[in-house]
């Protein structure tokens, strides 16, 4: 296997892993709605507002994350996005106020998602793979996001039932 092909396969593999984790964790947040709202005595609106902010920032920040990836490299943007995502999960697990939940689940994770999901990762894959293999490579990485939902939800639910919502979020942040 030549070096270029090995490099392309590594980008596809690591890109798929990043998207699997990012999307798998993100789509598990609904499992936390009831336990967080019940334990902290909030209405569901606090958690829903935090996730609405997350979606808004995720969408708004993607063009900027893409521009940063073009300028500084996708790997750096993915690392920073992953760090923001991790920090958001850890802060979310320690949050006991509406503001804390909005800043962690909303702002930090929303910005983290912009650096760890499709816009940055697919851009890197598109640059690394030969044109005749590009569609297949992008399809594999995109499918990894769906696989993440399938694979991560049972584990997230298991952690939630075993550890409770706060410790489960801390454990997911450690991943």
PLM feature spans:
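Helix-loop-helix hairpin linking two adjacent transmembrane segments in secondary transporters
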Residues: 141-175
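C-terminal ends and interior cores of transmembrane alpha-helices
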Residues: 83-96
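Helix-loop junctions at membrane interfaces in 12-TM secondary transporters
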Residues: 94-104
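Helix-to-loop junctions at the C-terminal end of transmembrane segments
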Residues: 61-73
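Cytoplasmic helix-loop-helix junction between adjacent transmembrane helices
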Residues: 105-143
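Residue-level signature of mid-helix packing/kink "hotspots" within the transmembrane helices
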Residues: 27, 55-63, 116, 149-150
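Extracytoplasmic
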Residues: 10-44, 62-65, 153
């Amino acid at each position: 296997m030549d070096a270029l092909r090995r490099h392309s396969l590594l980008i596809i593999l690591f890109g798929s892993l990043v998207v699997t984790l990012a999307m798998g964790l993100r789509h598990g947040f609904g499992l936390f709605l009831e336990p967080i709202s019940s334990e902290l005595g909030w209405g569901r609106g606090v958690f829903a507002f935090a996730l609405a902010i997350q979606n808004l920032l995720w969408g708004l920040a993607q063009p900027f994350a893409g521009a940063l990836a073009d300028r500084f490299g996708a790997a750096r943007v993915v690392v920073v996005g992953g760090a923001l995502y991790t920090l958001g999960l850890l802060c979310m697990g320690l949050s006991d106020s509406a503001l804390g939940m909005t800043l962690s689940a909303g702002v930090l994770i929303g910005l983290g998602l912009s650096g760890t999901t499709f816009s940055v990762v697919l851009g890197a894959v598109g640059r690394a793979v030969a044109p005749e293999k590009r569609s297949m490579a992008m399809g594999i990485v995109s499918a990894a996001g769906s696989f993440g939902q399938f694979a991560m939800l049972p584990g997230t639910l298991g952690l939630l039932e075993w550890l409770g919502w706060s410790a489960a979020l801390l454990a997911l942040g450690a991943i």
